[in-house]
């Protein structure tokens, strides 16, 4: 029996407000209790094409301090997934440090380049935390397009992902 768990958003406040940070101004993707977590300010890249593209936010009072981060960590420990695909934007790539079979499939299905790194440090990120606990995590970074265009371009591939299985 194959089972999939889909978390629609880890940041409901940010989705509602159109922001990366939660309601407390914390960048949740720098708040995970990863070994590389850093206190203080963090930078995120909001647009890979713009000249002024880095925005400064906070990482939280301590690793895993935010309820949203805690909830996702608890879920991961509860369900013990074999792998995770985390969807983001706007860097237009599939980030898979291990260049796994799934990462290669995603790159083809989404017609995005497969990269080993997004090109800048991501301390306290979900991917860093997953690496610390030995959970394969691939980050699918969509390009900066509207929700309608993303649905048109990627919905079929996202549905196909639910049926993906290794060929080994």
Residue ranges of model-derived segments:
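Active-site/substrate-binding loop(s) of hydrolase catalytic cores
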Residues: 1-117
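Active-site-adjacent mobile loop/cap segments within catalytic or ligand-binding domains
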Residues: 94-96, 103, 122-168
